């Protein structure tokens, strides 16, 4: 009798060991669904993105009208465009929930998996930023101007760096064409990095809600988790379609329906909702370089999570002190997101500064201390 092709064929074997016969902990909850949902988001964004690229013109005189042309004249262009725009929001919702799961259950102790994951977050943020510039509306143009301008805070080479990225002395045609190039290229680097992320994950196997070793109790990925993930996928698609078909512009900025005009600055320049927390931290520091560093560190601080883990237990599941801090951290992020969308005036400035300090205080100081206290409570 010949052996199963699924287990012997060099190519199929990889797929089999990753998605079919993969030994998985029997007790992983729905919080472990987000990895596959992110994969689905990436595929969806790539497909809708390629179809949009077929009809888009990366030129400042054509970009805005080519997007209007897609939504008006292309078959189902309105659907493809709205799914792509709202798919990005969904992508970030899943990313943030996925990272939150990792923080809660101590998944960051798989260092390589965690570090590749944070790298994926940074790549996705870069992709979303350059993508937002492409429709060439007011917020596209001014968002690009403000964010690229932050690089001028780099000592000595700052101004040269900004002009090099712009391809001139302001955000212009050269900027748009290169941003289109990056927006097309980066998702493929994300795919490559995702492979590396999974490679490292499958070296150790998944973590589970208890944070204990689950080698004694593994079940095959298929049919158990393939169907469990399918349920998550159906729910996610239902949510995406509801958003796309009923409230397509709910998360967008009305300013982006006005073509880019370098002579008129919008009253409130702000990024999409998924960057607002970082934008609030950037604005909270009354110094350009300081703000840029705080902005970067607010995300890069995640790289330190494995180093800052002081507890004898892996998850926060059974640690009331750290649990309180974790949920305070989440609430604080929501406050930052709200502040990022508000004008720069009191009381928002003060609230933003307090929330920015808390963001770093909780992660870098309070959580490690809580871990030590909880260890003492155990002994």
From Swiss-Prot:
One of its GO terms (cellular component) is mitochondrial inner membrane. A ubiquinone binds at residue 202. It comes from the Eukaryota. Binds 2 heme b groups non-covalently. It is found in: Mitochondrion inner membrane. The chain crosses the membrane at residues 34-54, 78-99, 114-134, 179-199, 227-247, 289-309, 321-341, 348-368. Its main location: mitochondrion. GO terms for biological process: mitochondrial electron transport, ubiquinol to cytochrome c. Heme b b566 binds at residues 98, 197. Keywords: Electron transport, Heme, Iron, Membrane, Metal-binding, Mitochondrion, Mitochondrion inner membrane, Respiratory chain, Transmembrane, Transmembrane helix, Transport, Ubiquinone. GO terms for molecular function: metal ion binding; ubiquinol-cytochrome-c reductase activity. It is a multi-pass membrane protein. Its cofactor is heme b. Heme b b562 binds at residues 84, 183. It holds the Pfam family Cytochrom_B_C. PANTHER family: CYTOCHROME B. Heme 1 (or BL or b562) is low-potential and absorbs at about 562 nm, and heme 2 (or BH or b566) is high-potential and absorbs at about 566 nm. Component of the ubiquinol-cytochrome c reductase complex (complex III or cytochrome b-c1 complex) that is part of the mitochondrial respiratory chain. The b-c1 complex mediates electron transfer from ubiquinol to cytochrome c. Contributes to the generation of a proton gradient across the mitochondrial membrane that is then used for ATP synthesis. The cytochrome bc1 complex contains 3 respiratory subunits (MT-CYB, CYC1 and UQCRFS1), 2 core proteins (UQCRC1 and UQCRC2) and probably 6 low-molecular weight proteins. Belongs to the cytochrome b family. This is Cytochrome b. It comes from Glyptemys muhlenbergii (Bog turtle). The lineage of its organism: Eukaryota, Metazoa, Chordata, Craniata, Vertebrata. The gene is MT-CYB.
């Amino acid at each position: 009798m010949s052996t199963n092709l699924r287990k012997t064929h060099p190519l199929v074997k990889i797929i089999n060991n990753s998605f079919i016969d993969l030994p998985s902990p029997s007790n992983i909850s729905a919080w472990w669904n987000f990895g596959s949902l992110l994969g689905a988001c990436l595929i969806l964004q790539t497909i809708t993105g390629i179809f949009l690229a077929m009809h888009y013109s990366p030129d400042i005189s054509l970009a805005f009208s080519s997007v209007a042309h897609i939504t008006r004249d292309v078959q189902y262009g309105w659907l493809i465009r709205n799914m792509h725009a709202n798919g990005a929001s969904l992508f970030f919702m899943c990313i943030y929930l996925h990272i939150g799961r990792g923080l809660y259950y101590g998944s960051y102790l798989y260092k390589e998996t965690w570090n590749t994951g944070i790298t994926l977050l940074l790549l996705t943020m870069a992709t979303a930023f350059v993508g937002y510039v492409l429709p060439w509306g007011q917020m596209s143009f001014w968002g690009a101007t403000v964010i690229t301008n932050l690089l001028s805070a780099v000592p000595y080479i700052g101004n040269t760096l900004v002009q090099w990225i712009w391809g001139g002395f302001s955000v212009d045609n050269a900027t748009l064409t290169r941003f289109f190039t990056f927006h097309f290229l980066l998702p493929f680097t994300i795919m490559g990095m995702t492979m590396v992320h999974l490679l490292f994950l499958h070296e150790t196997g998944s973590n589970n809600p208890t944070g204990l070793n689950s080698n004694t109790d593994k079940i095959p990925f298929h049919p158990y988790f393939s169907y469990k993930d399918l349920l998550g996928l159906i729910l996610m698609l239902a949510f995406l379609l509801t958003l796309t078909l009923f409230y397509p512009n709910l998360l967008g900025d009305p300013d982006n329906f006005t073509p880019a005009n370098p002579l008129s600055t919008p009253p409130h320049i702000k990024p999409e909702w998924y960057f607002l927390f970082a934008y609030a931290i950037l604005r909270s520091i009354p110094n350009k370089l300081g703000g840029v560093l705080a902005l970067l560190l607010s995300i890069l601080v995640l790289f330190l999570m494995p180093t800052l883990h002081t507890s004898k237990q892996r998850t926060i599941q059974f640690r009331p002190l750290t649990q309180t801090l974790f949920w305070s951290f989440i609430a604080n992020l929501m406050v930052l997101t709200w502040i990022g969308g508000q004008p720069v005036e009191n009381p928002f400035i003060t609230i933003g500064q307090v929330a920015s300090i808390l963001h770093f205080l909780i992660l870098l100081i309070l959580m490690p201390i809580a871990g030590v206290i909880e260890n003492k409570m155990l002994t």
